[in-house]
C-alpha cells in the first residue's frame, strides 16, 4: 500500500548513498559522547509532568526543496544534506558535503520536534519548556545554497513566549503548530498544560495576539452536554489540535452583526477523554477574529466509553467533507466524517434558540482501526507487556497522497490509506438522507494499514523511538525517511496513490506491446474476478522491518529469537501461504470454468464457420442466378420495345404525334413563301442604298487653299485665345479656392 516495489530509477540514486552520508556518522558519535553524561543525571532532573526524554517520539527532521535538515542537539544546529546533484538530479555527490546552520541564540531547552512554516522561511524548534523560531538564511549561487554554499552559516533565532515559560515553571508545552496561512505574517499556535491556546506573532513574540481559554468553555461557549462541568472538574484538558481547510462562516459566530460570511480556518481541539471541540480563527484583519468554542461535537454512533479515554492526537485530512483522525495511546484510530448536525438531535433541541447551533457539526465514526503497537507473538499471549503496552501516537500528513497518513510512536511506524473517500463523495452527492448508512458503506471496503517499522519487537525490550520522520514529495520521488534512535537512516519508496495491501497481479502489469482487450474493458465491473483475487490476497498483518532496541550490546536470548521467528512464520503462513492457496483454488476453479466455456465457444465457432461457408456458397449461387435473370430481363425488354414499335407502325389511323408532325409539315410551305418575300424586300433596299452611296461619292469635293500669311495669322489668333482662356481658367480657380476658404 505504501512501499513501492521495483528497480531503482535514475531519480532515486540518492536513496542508495544517503544512509552512508557523513552527517549520520557525526550524529552517532555525538550520541556516544552524550550517553555517559545523560546516564549520570539524577532522575529528578526530568520534569514529572513529561515523559522521560529517551522515550519521547521525536521528529527533528524535515525537508525543503530537495534538501534534508537534521537537528544536532549537541551543537544546536541544523545539518543540511543536499539530495539533488549539481545538475538537479539525484546523482551521488561527495558524502562529506553538507552545510551547518548555527543558532546565534541557541535554545536552552531540549528540542523534540521541528516544524517548517507554511511560507518555508522559518522553522519552529519545539521543546517541552519553550519554543524558538529559526529564520532560514538567504540562498544564492549556482546551486541555490544557503549564502552561496558556505559550510557554516549563522541563523537568527527568535524565542517565543520566553518570559511566559520562564516565569511559569510548572507549565509545559503540549502541542504547537503554525497558523496555516501563507499570505499573512507567520503566527505560532501554542497549547500549554494550563488548558489555554495562545497565538503569537513573530513581530511580537512575547505577547500573544489571541488567547483561547479552554477551561472556561462552560461559561463562554455554547455547551451541548450538561455533564461537561463535571468532566472539567475532573481535570480533563486538551491534548492536541489541528487546523482544517478554509471555510466560510457567518459573522455572528465571531460576535459581529450582519449576514455576511467570513473566511476562517476551523480549529479542531481534542481532549484527553475523546471529546472534540471546534472554533474558527481568522487573522486576516488585526487583531484577528476568534469564534466561540463549539462543542463537544456529538459522535455517531454513540459509545459508552466515548471511544476511549486516552486520546492523544488529532489530524484533519485535506478533503471535503473534512475527515478527522483521532488516535489514542492504546493504538486505536477513529476515522470521523465531519458532517452537518441533524435537526432531531437531542442536544440541539435544548438550545434551539441559539442561531449558532446550526454551525455545530457532528462526527460520524466511519471506522475504527487498531494499530499493532507491540508485535503479537505466537507464544506470548499470556505476557502482560503484550496487551498493556501503550504509548502516544503522532499523526503525519502525506503531502503526496491526501488520502493517506502516517503514524509514528515509540514502537515504530505505520501507514494508513483510506480507499473509501471517493465512495464517500459519491454517497454524499446522492439523494440519500440517512447518514447512518455510512456505517454500511464502511463495511464494503476498509482502510489499509501497513506496519512499516517495528522498534519494539519483543515485549520485554525497551522501545527505541525514532528521532525523525519525513516524506519527500518533490520530483526526487515520494519517499519515506525515518531516522532511528541511533541515527540510522531508513528509506522506503512510496506509491503516489493508495493501493490495497496485496501483491500486484500479472494482469495489472503495463505492457506497451500488448493492446488492451475490449473484453477486459467490459469486465471492469465492481464484481470482477481480479478484484475478487485482490480481496483474497489482501493482508491485514505484515512483517515490519525490525530495529534493534536501545540495548544493542545485549544479544536477545534464544527464546525471544524463537518467538520472533514463530511470529514471522505464522504471519507468512496465514497472510501469505494460506491466502495464496485460497487464491490458487479460486484461480483453478476459474480456469476450469473458463476451459469449459472455451470448449463450448470453440464448438460454437466451428458451427459458425460451417454456417458461414454454406451461406457463402448459397450467396454465390444466388449471384449467378441473379445475373442470368438480369440478362433474360434485358432480352425481354428489347423484344418488347421492338414489338411496340412494329405495332405502332402498323396502326391504320394516325397517332397524336403523327398528326402534330403533319400540321407542321403543312405549315412549312407558307413559311417558306413569307421568307422569300422578306428576302426580296431586303435585296431591293440594299440596291437602293448602294445607288444613293454612289451618287454621294461622285460629287466633287471643295478645296480651300490658304497662304502662308493667313496660316500665320490664324495660328497667332489661336495662340492668343488659348492664353486668354488659360488666364480665365486660372482666375476662376483662384476665385473658387477663395470662396471655399
Swiss-Prot record:
One of its GO terms (biological process) is ribosomal small subunit export from nucleus. GO terms for molecular function: structural constituent of nuclear pore. The modification N-acetylalanine is found at residue 2. The keyword Cytoplasm does not apply. The modification Phosphothreonine is found at residue 525. It is found in: Nucleus, Nuclear pore complex. Disulfide bonds: none annotated. Changing residue 434 to Y: In FADS4; no effect on localization to the nuclear pore complex; no effect on interaction with NUP214 and NUP62. Transmembrane segments: none annotated. It holds the Pfam family Nup88. Keywords: Acetylation, Coiled coil, Disease variant, mRNA transport, Nuclear pore complex, Nucleus, Phosphoprotein, Protein transport, Translocation, Transport. The keyword Heme does not apply. Ubiquitous. One of its GO terms (cellular component) is nuclear pore. Residues 585-651 form a coiled coil. The modification Phosphoserine is found at residues 35, 50, 379, 437, 442, 517, 540, 698. InterPro entries: Nucleoporin_Nup88, NUP88/NUP82. It is linked to Fetal akinesia deformation sequence 4: A clinically and genetically heterogeneous group of disorders with congenital malformations related to impaired fetal movement. Clinical features include fetal akinesia, intrauterine growth retardation, polyhydramnios, arthrogryposis, pulmonary hypoplasia, craniofacial abnormalities, and cryptorchidism. FADS4 inheritance is autosomal recessive. Interacts with NUP214/CAN. Interacts with NUP62 and NUP98. Component of nuclear pore complex. This is Nuclear pore complex protein Nup88. It comes from Homo sapiens. The gene is NUP88.
Amino acid at each position: 500500500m505504501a512501499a513501492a516495489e521495483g528497480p531503482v530509477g535514475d531519480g532515486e540514486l540518492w536513496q542508495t548513498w544517503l544512509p552512508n552520508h557523513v552527517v549520520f556518522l557525526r550524529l552517532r558519535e555525538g550520541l556516544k559522547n552524550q550517553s555517559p553524561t545523560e546516564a549520570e543525571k539524577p532522575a529528578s532532573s526530568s520534569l514529572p509532568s513529561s515523559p522521560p526524554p529517551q522515550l519521547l517520539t521525536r521528529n527533528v527532521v524535515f525537508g525543503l526543496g530537495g534538501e534534508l535538515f537534521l537537528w544536532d542537539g549537541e551543537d544546536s544546529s541544523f545539518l543540511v544534506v543536499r539530495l539533488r546533484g549539481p545538475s538537479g538530479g539525484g546523482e551521488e555527490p561527495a558524502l562529506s558535503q553538507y552545510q551547518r546552520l548555527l543558532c546565534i541564540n541557541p535554545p536552552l531547552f531540549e528540542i523534540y520536534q521541528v516544524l517548517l512554516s507554511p511560507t518555508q522561511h522559518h522553522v519552529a524548534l519545539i521543546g517541552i519548556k519553550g519554543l524558538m523560531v529559526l529564520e532560514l538564511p538567504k540562498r544564492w549561487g549556482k546551486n541555490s545554497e544557503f549564502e552561496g554554499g558556505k559550510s557554516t552559516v549563522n541563523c537568527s533565532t527568535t524565542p517565543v513566549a520566553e518570559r511566559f515559560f520562564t516565569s511559569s515553571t510548572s507549565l509545559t508545552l503540549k502541542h504547537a503548530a503554525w497558523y496555516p496561512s501563507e499570505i499573512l505574517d507567520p503566527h505560532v499556535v501554542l497549547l500549554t498544560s494550563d488548558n489555554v491556546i495562545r497565538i503569537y506573532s513573530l513581530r511580537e513574540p512575547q505577547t500573544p495576539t489571541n488567547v483561547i481559554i479552554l477551561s472556561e468553555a462552560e461559561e463562554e461557549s455554547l455547551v451541548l452536554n450538561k455533564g461537561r462541568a463535571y468532566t472539567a472538574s475532573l481535570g480533563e484538558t486538551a491534548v492536541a489540535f489541528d487546523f482544517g481547510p478554509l471555510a466560510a462562516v457567518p459573522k455572528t459566530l465571531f460576535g459581529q452583526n450582519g449576514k455576511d460570511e467570513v473566511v476562517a480556518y476551523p480549529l479542531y481541539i481534542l481532549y484527553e477523554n475523546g471529546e472534540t471541540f471546534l472554533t474558527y480563527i481568522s487573522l486576516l484583519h488585526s487583531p484577528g477574529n476568534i469564534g466561540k468554542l463549539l462543542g463537544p461535537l456529538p459522535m455517531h454512533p454513540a459509545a459508552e466509553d466515548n471511544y476511549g479515554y486516552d486520546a492523544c492526537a488529532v489530524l484533519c485530512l485535506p478533503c471535503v467533507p473534512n475527515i478527522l483522525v483521532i488516535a489514542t495511546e492504546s493504538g486505536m484510530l477513529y476515522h470521523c466524517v465531519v458532517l452537518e448536525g441533524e435537526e432531531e438531535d437531542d442536544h440541539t433541541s435544548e438550545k434551539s434558540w441559539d442561531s449558532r447551533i446550526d454551525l455545530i457539526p457532528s462526527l460520524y465514526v466511519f471506522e475504527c482501526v487498531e494499530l499493532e503497537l507491540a508485535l503479537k507473538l505466537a507464544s506470548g499471549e499470556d505476557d502482560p507487556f503484550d496487551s498493556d503496552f501503550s504509548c502516544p501516537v503522532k499523526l503525519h500528513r502525506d503531502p503526496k497522497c491526501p488520502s493517506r497518513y502516517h503514524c509514528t510512536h515509540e514502537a515504530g511506524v505505520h501507514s494508513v490509506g483510506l480507499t473509501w473517500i471517493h465512495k464517500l463523495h459519491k454517497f454524499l452527492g446522492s439523494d440519500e438522507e440517512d447518514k447512518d448508512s455510512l456505517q454500511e458503506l464502511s463495511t464494503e471496503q476498509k482502510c489499509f494499514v501497513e506496519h512499516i517499522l517495528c522498534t519494539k519487537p519483543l515485549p520485554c525490550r525497551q522501545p527505541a523511538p525514532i528521532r525523525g520522520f519525513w516524506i519527500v514529495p518533490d520530483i526526487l520521488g515520494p519517499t519515506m525517511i525515518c531516522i532511528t534512535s541511533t541515527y540510522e537512516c531508513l528509506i522506503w519508496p512510496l506509491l503516489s496513490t493508495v493501493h490495497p495491501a496485496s501483491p500486484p497481479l500479472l494482469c495489472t502489469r503495463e505492457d506497451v506491446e500488448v493492446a488492451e482487450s475490449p473484453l477486459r474493458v467490459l469486465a471492469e465491473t465492481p464484481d470482477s474476478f481480479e478484484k475478487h483475487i485482490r480481496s483474497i490476497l489482501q493482508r491485514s498483518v505484515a512483517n515490519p522491518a525490525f530495529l534493534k532496541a536501545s540495548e544493542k550490546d545485549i544479544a536477545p536470548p534464544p527464546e525471544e529469537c524463537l518467538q520472533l521467528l514463530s511470529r514471522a512464520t505464522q504471519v507468512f503462513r496465514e497472510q501469505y501461504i494460506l491466502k495464496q492457496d485460497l487464491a490458487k483454488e479460486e484461480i483453478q476453479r476459474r480456469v476450469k470454468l473458463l476451459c469449459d466455456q472455451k470448449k463450448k465457444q470453440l464448438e460454437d465457432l466451428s458451427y459458425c464457420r460451417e454456417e458461414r461457408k454454406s451461406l457463402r456458397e448459397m450467396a454465390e449461387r444466388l449471384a449467378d442466378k441473379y445475373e442470368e435473370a438480369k440478362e433474360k430481363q434485358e432480352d425481354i425488354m428489347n423484344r418488347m420495345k421492338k414489338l411496340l414499335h412494329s405495332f405502332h407502325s402498323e396502326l391504320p389511323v394516325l397517332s397524336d404525334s403523327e398528326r402534330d408532325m403533319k400540321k407542321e409539315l403543312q405549315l412549312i410551305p407558307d413559311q417558306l413563301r413569307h421568307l422569300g418575300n422578306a428576302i426580296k424586300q431586303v435585296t431591293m433596299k440594299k440596291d437602293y442604298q448602294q445607288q444613293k452611296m454612289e451618287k454621294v461619292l461622285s460629287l466633287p469635293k471643295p478645296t480651300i487653299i490658304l497662304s502662308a500669311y493667313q496660316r500665320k495669322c490664324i495660328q497667332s489668333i489661336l495662340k492668343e485665345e488659348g492664353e486668354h482662356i488659360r488666364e480665365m481658367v486660372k482666375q476662376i480657380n483662384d476665385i473658387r479656392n477663395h470662396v471655399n476658404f
